Amino acid sequence: MKKLYKAITVICILMSNLQSAQGATKSVQVPIRTEVKIPTCQLEIDSSIDFSFVKIEDIISSRATSKEANLNFRCDAHVDNVRIMFVPGSNRTSSDKRVMHSGTTGLGYSLQWSRASSGYSDIGFNTQYQWSDSDAYQNLLSGKLRLKPVSFPGESLSKEGKVSSTINIEVTYD
């Protein structure tokens, strides 16, 4: 019986060592770090719009020449749903939003916009327009802005002098 007891003891010891080897658990924590960034984008315009000298009668008769500027929207990564809006610095527009007030009585500017893939279209101020939709592009969108001096509706243009105005260009994207 002693031999049987010794044999059972040896078997139990071996089994307990085997179970503890199989049942051992080790854990290690793995650090995870992430930096989430919104793509950085820049809006570039190639020049200011300078009409120099314009005759009052050319503005009143709609014969004044338009001037244009190129716009580029560059991002360090692809962005979607790019929208653009032109906001007059004077915050005044005609009732149909097609003419911005210059800040000088009777003088305004009409606006046309062209995406790189299309021709010019008359557009309103203070309204968002789609710049990208299903168009394929590689982190760069191009467009053109065209302004023309015109009579501001409901006001008489009779005063001469230098005029400085601004347009704020707002671009929104996802």
UniProtKB/Swiss-Prot annotation:
Gene3D superfamilies per record: Fimbrial-type adhesion domain (2.60.40.1090)
Record-annotated site: Required for stability and transport: Y173
Record GO cellular component, one term: pilus
Keywords: Disulfide bond, Fimbrium, Plasmid, Signal
UniProt-annotated location(s): Fimbrium
Top-level lineage group: Bacteria
Signal peptide extent: 1-21
Any one GO biological process: cell adhesion
Disulfide linkage: C41-C75
Coiled coil (UniProt feature): none
Function field: Involved in the biosynthesis of K99 fimbriae.
The name this protein goes by in its record: Protein FanG
